[in-house]
Amino acid sequence: MTHDHNHDHEHEERELITLVDEQGNETLFEILLTIDGKEEFGKNYVLLIPANAEEDENGEVEIQAYSFTENEDGTEGDLQPIPEDSDAEWDMIEEVFNSFMEE
């Protein structure tokens, strides 16, 4: 999934998150969009772009999507990759993302 940055939208206050990979490397990401999917899938989703992302030759930036469930205390839980074969989840994410981009 990519995000075209050749449009106007205000980045008033960026929400940032640090992800740590299996090797312990930290990468800073900007939260592009959160999606409430609890009713349909029992979890929420977040779309991230690297905080210092450079646009490619087409003016696009790579987007990463993850799911998460809230902990019992109301805090956000760990991010989980979305299974590639979960077509219903990916279709919902794409639909919400496309609506977001039209705004």
Swiss-Prot record:
It comes from Streptococcus sanguinis (strain SK36). InterPro entries: UPF0473. This is UPF0473 protein SSA_2239. It comes from the Bacteria. HAMAP family: UPF0473. Belongs to the UPF0473 family.
